[in-house]
């Protein structure tokens, strides 16, 4: 079958995939199934040659169609496309491009054929002549003049294309020859995987360079968030199996996608106001030219008013609940929200979790901390050191709990998780302890660790997305209307004098009954909290719900 026909079938599959309602299912099917359809094709053709550029462009457009649908963006920046093609362990989405796989797949298949065919068919001596080993090809490439062709012609077309593919790989990742020369590569799959790892690492360095070029020196939030995203290889690579791993709301998954690709979640073309802290869009970050309110959701995550609101209910509490369930599965006894756990220390301190091994005398006191690498205090170090925000959060927790817990003979663990998904050292140690308590063999420990990390990371990403949606800035016009509503609800001529002449007030002033009512004694107005119930209930949209919360905050503050 021609290559173009196979790619046309892949295009039809991606077109059908777009009809799936759940966009998490779209991503998983594309990442786990459709992307791998061309893997065996690329092992049999020199896909890195210029003759396949048109087919490669068609295939990459199909793969990126999933990203465009999820992010509702017909045009993607070059950095976002590069991030989407990276593996999930390097901060990407795992949607592999044609060029990132073609040369590695062809060289791996050729190296296996050149090694196995002469051994399996010793009577066919021409195989050894027409299929020289990759070491022979590398020696010919090394003896060639820089910028020129090899001194000896290739004995076959396959050897010719293999030498060109190997030259392209060496130009991108010089360690490819050492991988080919090693003796532990038993299958083409394993060899292709190891070569692709080298290429991905070089692509990762290029992506980091592009991100650093877009950042500012005072507030490098892109690098900080990308480093945190690199600590989460599970969220966009996990097949939904249960309630914890299934994301039913497409809007939450779209926010997670945009954060992963460093794309704006909602444009900030007009004046906006944070519904939680009421900061306006013209305020700037200290010691920086960047604005506090941003279209990427950073302020929504670390807003000071959100730490005790949506950030706790949508992010912190679900992580505590999932972590408790994981520890219970490992056989530990778990208590939630345990107060007065300290024998020596300030009374009233409440731990998120208190776990104990069966038959053990020591308790494990766990306090979960959510950290954001994009805050003004952490952003510069987080852009240089992955996991810095989680490390600082653990230090703060240890200062608060550590010496008191150690004095009473128990063990304290500060479970810190960043907004991008990176975990602190204490969190990793706790999950390793639970995995060892659950199973004895290496396979059981690895399976439990994967199970636990999948649920922790997905819960974190979903909690961050819901926090952003709950605190996303609303239009400044809505705040003006809120102030007008507040003025209507308060008694007295001082508040009424500042009201704008809306349609309802004009009807009131122009009505015939107004002349008879203005001579009557003024009736006592009820409290503003009572009149809140007379307002029409807002529609179930994000901005109107945020407007309703802003109304209640304004009424309570006055």
Segments predicted by a language model, with ranges:
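Cationic, low-complexity basic patches in intrinsically disordered or flexible, solvent-exposed regions
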Residues: 507, 516-532, 544, 553
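Compositionally biased intrinsically disordered regions enriched in polar/charged residues
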Residues: 538-539, 546-549
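Post-transcriptional modification and biogenesis factors for structured RNAs
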Residues: 511
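Nucleic-acid-interacting cores, centered on viral/eukaryotic replication and modification enzymes
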Residues: 1-508, 547
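Low-complexity intrinsically disordered segments
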Residues: 499-502, 514, 538-539
């Amino acid at each position: 079958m021609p290559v173009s026909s196979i790619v046309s079938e892949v295009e039809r599959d991606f077109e059908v995939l777009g009809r799936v309602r759940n966009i998490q299912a779209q991503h998983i099917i594309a990442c786990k199934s459709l992307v791998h359809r061309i893997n065996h094709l690329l092992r049999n053709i020199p896909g890195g040659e210029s003759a396949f550029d048109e087919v490669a462009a068609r295939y990459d457009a199909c793969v990126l169609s999933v990203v465009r649908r999820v992010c509702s963006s017909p045009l993607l920046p070059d950095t976002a496309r590069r991030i989407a093609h990276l593996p999930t362990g390097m901060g990407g989405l795992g949607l592999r491009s044609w060029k990132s796989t073609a040369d590695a797949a062809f060289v791996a298949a050729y190296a296996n054929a050149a090694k196995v065919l002469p051994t399996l068919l010793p009577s066919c001596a021409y195989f050894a002549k027409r299929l020289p080993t990759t070491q022979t090809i590398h020696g010919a490439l090394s003896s060639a003049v820089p910028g020129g062709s090899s001194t000896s012609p290739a004995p076959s077309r396959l050897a010719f294309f293999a030498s060109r593919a190997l030259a392209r790989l060496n130009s991108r990742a010089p360690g490819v020859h050492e991988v080919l020369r090693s003796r532990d590569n038993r299958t083409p799959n394993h060899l292709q995987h190891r070569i692709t790892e080298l290429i991905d690492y070089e692509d990762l360095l290029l992506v980091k360079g592009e991100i650093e070029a877009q950042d500012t020196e005072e507030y490098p939030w892109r690098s900080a968030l990308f480093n945190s995203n690199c600590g989460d290889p599970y969220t966009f690579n996990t097949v939904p199996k249960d309630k914890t791993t299934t994301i039913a709301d497409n809007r939450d998954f779209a926010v997670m996608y945009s954060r992963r690709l460093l794309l704006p979640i909602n444009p900030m073309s007009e004046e906006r106001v944070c519904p939680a802290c009421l900061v306006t869009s013209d305020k700037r970050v200290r010691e920086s030219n960047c604005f506090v309110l941003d279209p990427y959701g950073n302020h929504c995550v670390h807003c000071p008013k959100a730490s005790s609101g949506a950030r706790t209910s949508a992010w912190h509490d679900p992580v505590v609940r999932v972590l408790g369930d994981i520890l219970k599965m490992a056989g530990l006894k778990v208590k939630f929200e345990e107060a007065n756990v300290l024998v020596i220390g300030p009374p009233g301190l409440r731990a998120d979790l208190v776990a104990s091994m069966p038959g053990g005398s020591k308790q494990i006191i766990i306090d979960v901390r959510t950290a954001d690498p994009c805050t003004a205090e952490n952003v510069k170090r987080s852009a240089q050191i992955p996991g810095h925000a989680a490390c600082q959060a653990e230090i703060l927790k240890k200062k608060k709990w550590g010496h008191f817990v150690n004095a009473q003979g128990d063990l304290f663990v500060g479970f810190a998780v960043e907004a991008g998904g990176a975990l602190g050292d204490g969190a990793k140690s706790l999950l390793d302890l639970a995995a060892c308590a659950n199973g004895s063999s290496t396979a059981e420990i690895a399976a439990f660790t994967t199970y636990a990390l999948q649920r922790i990371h997905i819960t974190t990403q979903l909690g961050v997305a819901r926090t952003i949606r709950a605190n996303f800035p609303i239009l400044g016009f809505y705040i003006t209307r809120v102030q007008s509503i507040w003025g209507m609800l308060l008694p007295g001529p001082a508040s009424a004098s500042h009201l704008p002449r809306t349609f309802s007030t004009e009807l009131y002033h122009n009505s015939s009954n107004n002349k008879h009512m203005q001579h009557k004694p003024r009736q006592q107005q009820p409290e503003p909290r009572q009149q809140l119930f007379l307002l029409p209930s807002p529609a179930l949209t994000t901005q109107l719900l945020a407007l309703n919360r802003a109304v209640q905050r304004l009424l309570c503050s006055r």
